[in-house]
C-alpha cells in the first residue's frame, strides 16, 4: 500500500508504483486541488492502476484526512508514503483547525506570517503526517526546504529530535537549486524507515551536481544526468562514504552535531601543507610586512584627510532659509 498526502498529479506515486510493480501496488492519495486530483486519476488509468481510482481523494489532508483505520478513529497506516508538500500556499484559514489536533501534530503547528501568509512552514505539518501514516515497518520520503535539516529551534528542531531519537530517519539527500519544477527553494529529500534496524544514517550533498538550462518560460533550472542520478542512488543504497559527497553517521554522532542532517557538517576538514625553505619563508614574511605597512600608512592618510574635511565644515545659518 502506497500513499501520498499531497499527491499533486501523482508523479511520485507513479514512480513508486513502477519500482514496486503495478500488480503488487495499491495507491492511496489525497490532494487539496480538484484539478490535480483529476489529473492523478488519469495517470492511474494510463498506468494500469484502475483498481486504485476510488482511493484518489480530493480534500484537505491536514484538516480532514480521508484515509482512516477501520474504526475511523486513527489515521490509516501504509507501507510506503511519499510527499512533495506545498511550499507556497496560504493555509491561514485552516491553521487553527490544524492546531486543534495536538495528538497528530505533536511538534506543533507553525504560525502564519503577518505579511507573506503563503510562506507559512506548512511542510512541517506534512512531515508529522507522513511519520504518523507509516506502519511500524513502513518507509517514507518527503521533499523539504534544505534549511530544515540544520534547524536549531522551533518546530523544525523538535521534529529533528524526534526522528533522530526514535531512529526513524534513514537518510537525507540535499539537492541542487532549482531542480524541482514547482519551486526555486533549495530542497532536500528526507527518508524515513520506521523499522529502526539501521545503525547509521546516510547523508548526501548533491547540491553541486547538475547542469543549468532554461525551461519553456525562460527560467533557470537544473537537471541531473543519468550518471549523476546513478551516483546518488548507488551511494545511498550502499551507504557509501565518498569524499566531499556523502557520509554514513551514527545517531549518536548526529546528536553530537546538534541533530544536523547536513552532510557537509560531517566532512573532514582538509589542510594542505606546503614545504618551503627558510629563505622562502623569510621572503613571504617580508612581503606580508611591507604590504601591511603600506596599507596601514594609506589608512592613516585617509583618517587625516577625513579629519581635515570635518574641520573645514562650518555652520551656515542661511541653508534652508526662505529669505
Q: What are these language model-derived features?
A:
Residues 1-83, 88-92, 97-99, 144-147, ...:
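Conserved S-adenosyl-L-methionine
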Residues 75-323:
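A conserved structural/catalytic subdomain of Rossmann-like adenosyl-cofactor enzymes
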Amino acid at each position: 500500500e502506497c500513499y501520498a498526502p499531497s499527491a499533486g498529479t501523482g508523479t511520485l506515486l507513479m514512480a513508486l508504483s513502477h519500482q514496486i510493480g503495478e500488480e503488487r501496488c495499491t495507491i492511496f492519495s489525497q490532494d487539496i486541488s480538484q484539478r490535480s486530483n483529476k489529473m492523478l486519476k488519469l495517470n492511474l488509468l494510463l498506468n494500469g492502476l484502475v483498481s486504485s481510482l476510488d482511493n484518489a481523494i480530493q480534500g484537505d489532508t491536514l484538516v480532514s484526512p480521508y484515509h482512516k483505520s477501520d474504526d475511523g478513529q486513527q489515521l490509516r497506516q501504509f507501507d510506503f508514503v511519499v510527499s512533495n508538500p506545498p511550499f507556497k500556499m496560504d493555509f491561514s484559514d485552516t491553521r487553527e483547525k490544524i492546531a486543534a489536533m495536538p495528538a497528530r501534530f505533536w511538534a506543533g503547528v507553525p504560525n502564519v506570517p503577518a505579511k507573506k501568509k503563503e510562506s507559512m512552514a506548512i511542510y512541517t505539518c506534512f512531515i508529522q503526517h507522513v511519520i504518523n501514516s507509516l506502519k511500524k515497518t513502513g518507509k517514507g520520503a518527503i521533499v523539504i526546504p534544505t534549511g530544515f535539516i540544520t534547524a536549531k529551534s522551533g518546530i523544525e528542531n523538535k521534529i529533528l529530535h524526534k526522528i533522530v531519537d526514535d531512529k526513524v530517519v534513514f537518510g537525507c539527500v540535499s539537492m541542487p537549486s532549482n531542480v524541482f519544477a514547482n519551486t526555486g527553494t533549495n530542497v532536500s529529500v528526507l527518508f524515513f524507515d520506521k523499522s529502526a534496524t539501521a545503525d547509521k544514517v546516510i547523508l548526501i550533498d548533491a547540491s553541486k551536481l547538475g547542469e543549468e538550462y532554461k525551461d519553456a518560460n525562460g527560467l533557470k533550472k537544473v537537471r541531473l544526468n543519468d550518471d549523476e542520478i546513478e551516483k546518488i542512488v548507488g551511494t545511498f543504497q550502499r551507504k557509501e562514504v565518498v569524499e566531499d559527497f556523502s557520509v554514513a553517521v551514527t545517531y549518536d554522532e548526529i546528536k553530537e552535531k546538534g541533530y544536523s542532517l547536513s552532510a557537509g557538517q560531517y566532512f573532514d576538514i582538509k589542510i594542505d601543507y606546503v614545504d618551503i625553505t627558510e629563505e622562502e619563508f623569510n621572503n613571504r614574511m617580508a612581503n606580508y610586512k611591507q604590504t601591511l605597512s603600506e596599507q596601514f600608512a594609506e589608512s592613516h592618510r585617509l583618517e587625516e584627510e577625513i579629519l581635515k574635511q570635518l574641520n573645514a565644515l562650518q555652520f551656515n545659518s542661511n541653508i534652508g532659509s526662505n529669505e
